[in-house]
Amino acid sequence: MKIVISPAKKMQTDGGFLPKSQPVFLDQAEELWSYLHSLDQAGLEKVWRANAKITEEARQMLAADLTQPQVPALFAYSGLQYQYLAADVLDQAGLDYLDQHLRVLSGLYGSLRPFDGIVPYRLEMKSPLPAFKYKSLYEFWGEKVYQELYQDDSVVLNLASKEYSHLLTPFLKEGDRLLEVVFQEEKNGKWRTQATHAKMARGRLVRWLAEGGRDLSDLPGFTDFGYAFAPDQSGEDRVVFRKKA
């Protein structure tokens, strides 16, 4: 089983751990890095969908050398999901579990193992790519990420957003399973996903799996934040957790 999660916009360079490996798709990342270097201010503003001030600040990231990474991927992202995953306080068994099972989907790096060394960057899957030979990052990556994830596993637990899981969905073949995890809350008689709470729950679920060395059969036992497994809403490719608001 593999577990996929989205990256986070917020990143840091001091995670307290050293990288153990290079990203599988480092060559492709360097191609994208070179493309970003080739753009002028206006081009970067389009790619990053940012104003001049934010673009100038983000542009400083491009001075980094991808072959001299600063921090492992698992500790480079500091968004809400990663805060609740809290990998920095997992024991070695938990970290080993994540190293084996967890992958971070990335616009720049494609797919990252937890201890792949990376640098801070700004590049989302839906970023426009002016003056590039590919129309989109989806076209650039094609089947590469799918093939890497499914070469040894037929089951992937999907905790990523649709923006990132679309790196996989168009290429699924018979026998492949992409098991989506959904967190819902009841409000005004309707069940909806509350984005902030879902990010927290995704991070906590990854941690819960790692702490117990758990697999798919254990998923119904997750009850953090008051969520409970909803068997009537779940199915072959969907696991739903619900709670009363």
From Swiss-Prot:
GO biological process: response to hydroperoxide
Source organism of this protein record: Lactobacillus delbrueckii subsp. bulgaricus (strain ATCC 11842 / DSM 20081 / BCRC 10696 / JCM 1002 / NBRC 13953 / NCIMB 11778 / NCTC 12712 / WDCM 00102 / Lb 14)
The protein's name: UPF0246 protein Ldb2075
Family indicated by similarity: Belongs to the UPF0246 family.
GO cellular component, one term: cytosol
Any one Pfam family match given in the protein's UniProt record, by short name: H2O2_YaaD
Signal peptide coordinates: none
